[in-house]
Each structure stands twice: as structure tokens, then as C-alpha cells.
């Protein structure tokens, strides 16, 4: 399926995405997951990633292009986030361990001590800052809409053109909340991950989804 990327021009100023690395807040629990031995904890830098958010992080079958083994798996993780994680681990003098984790499980994994950091497109909201600390952002991106090429909304040029469209975004992201700013649309339930949204777009279950530009370009290039 061909996909088309449409800029949400009217939202650019207020909806800039910040990608951050984050560590557990000093006020949060320091308890470690039982399976993580103390020796391993001190010698490794365990980073949580979805491994499904290209071009920032993805899953592949080999170690080409600098990919890193995924903990407990025969697969590997690659992407910009992985490269940043490698640099941080190197600076700490520790071995990098990538822990593949669903988006909704990243914060619990960090606060429980299962991982040492999250390196992902996670905005530093006030609620999140109550339990975890954020680094300075290392990337900013505009939000865009991904629609089906040749579909009903292929010629949309502004957010007003999406009246009646069935739209969604990823669960527990501010991408989903911005749909409320688009008048007259049908806000579908949020989805767990981007592969699911791409399939939903292919099948006609949705007319578009909100994402950041690099992910949208990746989706467009893959089809």
C-alpha cells in the first residue's frame, strides 16, 4: 500500500515532539527485577526500546549496520536510538543490553529496575516527571498525518480537510490527544503500535494516523 504524508501545518508550533533519554527519578523505587543479577546490573547498561519505531528503533534478523542483540531473543535492534544507546554505554564503560518492551510497559520497566533507561520518543510530561527524570531532548520533529495514497483524504492540504475522517494514534502518547484539535473527525480507539496502525490504514479501518515526520517517511518508503 502506498502511503502519503501530510503535514499538520496548523499544529506545528504547539506540537513539537521531544525525543528524550530518561532514567528513574531519585524518588522512585530502586527495587531491581528478580531476574537481573546485581553483577549484571553493575556491568551492563539496560535500555528499553519498542524496537518497532523506525527509523529510531526497529527489529531485524542480523547484526548488520551496527545492530545490537535483543535480550532474550535471536533478533537484533537497530536505529538512531540504538546508536545513541551505544554511545552512552561506551561512555559509561558498560555493555549495552537492549530490552524489547512494549510502549505501555516502558515506564513500569524503568521504575521497577528492569531497565536502566528509556531512549525513545517520550515527551517529558508533568505526570511522567513525577516518577522519572528526563535528559535534555536530542531531537525534535513536527507531527504529520499518514493517509492512504489514492484514498479519500489523499488531496487534503489542511486539518480542516479531514472532516469525517477516522483517525487514531498510538496509545498513551500526546499524538492521540491532538486529534481533539481537529474538528469533525471520528476519533478511533488508540492503537498499541505503529505496525498495527499501518495495517489498519491498509484495510480501511482508519483513514489516517498521527505520527512524527521520520516515522511517516519510513512508512511511506516501506510501501
Name each model-derived stretch:
Residues 90, 95-161:
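Acidic, polar ligand-binding/catalytic clefts
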Residues 10-20:
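Bacterial N-terminal signal peptides
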Residues 19-32:
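Bacterial lipoprotein signal-peptidase II cleavage site
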Residues 104-105, 121-131, 178-181, 202-223:
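A ligand-binding cleft/hinge motif common to bilobed small-molecule-binding domains
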Residues 38-122:
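Extracytoplasmic small-molecule ligand-binding "clamshell" domains
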Residues 46-49, 66-75, 158-173, 187:
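Short loop->beta-strand "edge-of-pocket" segments that line small-molecule binding or catalytic clefts
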Residues 60-72, 85-94, 172-192, 220-222:
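Ligand-binding cleft/hinge of the Venus flytrap
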Residues 80-83, 97-108, 154, 188-199, ...:
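Short helix-initiation/N-cap motifs at beta->coil->alpha
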Amino acid at each position: 500500500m502506498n502511503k502519503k504524508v501530510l503535514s499538520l501545518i496548523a499544529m506545528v508550533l504547539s506540537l513539537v515532539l521531544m525525543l528524550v533519554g530518561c532514567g528513574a527519578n531519585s524518588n522512585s523505587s530502586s527495587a531491581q527485577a528478580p531476574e537481573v543479577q546485581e553483577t549484571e546490573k553493575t556491568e551492563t547498561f539496560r535500555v528499553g526500546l519498542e524496537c518497532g519505531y523506525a527509523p529510531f528503533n526497529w527489529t531485524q534478523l542480523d547484526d548488520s549496520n551496527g545492530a545490537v542483540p535483543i535480550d532474550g531473543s535471536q533478533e537484533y535492534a537497530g536505529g538512531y536510538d540504538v546508536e545513541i544507546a551505544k554511545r552512552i554505554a561506551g561512555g559509561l564503560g558498560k555493555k549495552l543490553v537492549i530490552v524489547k518492551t512494549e510502549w505501555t510497559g516502558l515506564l513500569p520497566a524503568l521504575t521497577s529496575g528492569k531497565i536502566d533507561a528509556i531512549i525513545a520518543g517520550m515527551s517529558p510530561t508533568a505526570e511522567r516527571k513525577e516518577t522519572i527524570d528526563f535528559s535534555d531532548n536530542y531531537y525534535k520533529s513536527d507531527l504529520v498525518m499518514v493517509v492512504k495514497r489514492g484514498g479519500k483524504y489523499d488531496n487534503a492540504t489542511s486539518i480542516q480537510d479531514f472532516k469525517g475522517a477516522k483517525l487514531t494514534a498510538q496509545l498513551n502518547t500526546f499524538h492521540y490527544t491532538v486529534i481533539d484539535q481537529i474538528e469533525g473527525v471520528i476519533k478511533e480507539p488508540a492503537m498499541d503500535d505503529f505496525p498495527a496502525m499501518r495495517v489498519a490504514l491498509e484495510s480501511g479501518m482508519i483513514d489516517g494516523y498521527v505520527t512524527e515526520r521520520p516515522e511517516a517517511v519510513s512508512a511511506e518508503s516501506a510501501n
